[in-house]
Amino acid sequence: MAVLIMVALVVAVMLGLVIGPVSIAATRILGDAFSHLGIGHSTLTSTQSSIVWQLRAPRMVLGLLAGSMLAVAGGTYQGVFRNPLADPYLLGVAAGAGLGATLAIVDVANAATVPTWTPLLAFVGAMLAVTLTWVIGGRSMRSTAATLVLAGVAVSALFTSAQTFLQQRSSVQSIANVYIWLLGSLANASWHSVLVVIPYVVVCALVCVLAGRALDVMSVGDDEARSLGLSVRSVRLVVVVASSLGTAAVVSVVGLIGFVGIIVPHIVRLLVGTSYRRILPLSVLFGAAFLVLADTVARTVMAPSELPLGVVTAVIGAPVFVVILSVRRMGHS
């Protein structure tokens, strides 16, 4: 199964580089890549080379990073909270990032500085929301997963109401810009944004994957896990910090992209079973492939215009999620 997912990932990467308003053959792209290593000669024009390496490649890499982080964070949350409906935005990341981005677009930045301020304040807002959630619902030694989730719901409601207030006092153009950001997109991807996000994703995703064994133990219940010698609160803190930090970094750059973190772990679970030691690493690969394919659809189905990436993931994700729930219901009946 891991091999099949790897093949799907390679296919997604090639499609992301090949398909677009200007189609470029995969063999020519590979030839150009080898020519940069001093092997052979490129058959691409300078314009085609720029399209591939300055536009499509950073977009594809950012899609790989975002998809892998959202998927593994969703799987981790589903494990640590023992909630199959958990996603990476459970503890207020989406609401906090939305408030930060709205503040940047409406009040702080001008047209020239929006690309700088929006991801910065979105990241700060996301981490502030998660921190507040933990302070309210997670710092007590007696705190449970349910307490933390309820705190996340309350914090999300607070931040969302503040975001709505900001939007009500802003211009029509600012509201439109906020709306575009909230739907998510890789259109502004660059090598700079890739370099900003990659350390967060690599470290945080690795922590989540390594927590798989502990999540398997916690799946039997907190009390049982403690009786087996596991520090449940410490594991929960580390996992929540890693998942939230990685998600905040991704969301600050690409906006809010739904369904990746909830459906990918479910699909992987159907394929490989219920052990998080297998679910989490495969979710990294599957999530990366899924988001790159979704972005390819988003930028080509209405070319030269683009669909918001969040719309594409919702159109794909909602029916898939219904099918998954039906399969699980049939399995339990």
Give the residues covered by each predicted segment.
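Alpha-helical transmembrane segments in inner-membrane proteins
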Residues: M1-S333
